[in-house]
Amino acid sequence: MHMRTLRLAGALACASALQMPMKMPRSAAGRAESPRMIGSLFDILGGAGPQLIEPENALPGRKEKMQINDRHRVLGTKMDDVPEGHKVAVFANGCFWGSEKGIWRLPGDGITCTAVGYCAGFTPNPTYQEACSGATGHTEGVRVVYDPAKISFVDILRWFWEAHDPTSGMRQGNDVGTQYRSGFYYFDDDQKQLIEASKAAYEKALGRPITTEIAAAADYDQYGGLWYFAEAYHQQYLASPGARPYCSAQPQGISLPPFDTWAPAALKDAYAPKLGEDFWKQHAPAKGCSVVNSPNEPIVM
């Protein structure tokens, strides 16, 4: 029953994608029906909602890596490169189209490159259709290569929290399934401390429990790695010709409390925010996922 329920949920959430190579033909109205349809099926089958697949039941995957474009569509930087002195952040907060655009637009030249992909799952090199089925364990994610001399990890973290509803479990807006769960994955102890401390502060600000998955990137080495690039047509999708302005993220309109009130004392100097409150007053994520209709170019302050 568990596997049947999970696969039906994934099939409904990605019905069009299983029939076509891209998910752009799905209208927002069509996707809005998915939660109701899935809810009815769960009632019939006696399930409680999407549940993460067990590693031993995940699809086997493949050795071949996904082919992607060499350069970022907007920033022009190399997609699979981490320059010296740069760091990486990987997170998931809903449909990766809008999540990626919000991050690449952050000002100050600190964001060197972004990419969308499948993270925190158990199947090597999954396809979109496989990840969307719920049978790989992945969630739609964003990989950020950034220059810590120009933008703080805390700036990225704040955007992450404020750009979605981190309390919604295995869904984000009209998108339902384990592939839409919220998550942030750390590469060192500093990132771990900052993620956990900011979560506690934002949870208090929201007034309800946060369901965001927090885990070490190294936890997924046994499954081939944390991160796999998505297909080329998903990369910087909202900046591609003919892109449909779809975004299901649910910003709550609530700010992360001031850094000084929640940051671990030992990290306050090294990770002080570089984006000032003037930026957040003008460009903070707004209800309605306004990022989809914003310019493609990075914000200039």
Features from the language model and the residues they span:
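N-terminal chloroplast transit peptides
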Residues: 1-25
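Short coil/turn segments at secondary-structure boundaries
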Residues: 5, 28-29, 147-148
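Short linear motifs centered on serine/threonine within intrinsically disordered regions
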Residues: 25-28, 33
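Flexible coil/turn and secondary-structure edge motifs
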Residues: 33-301
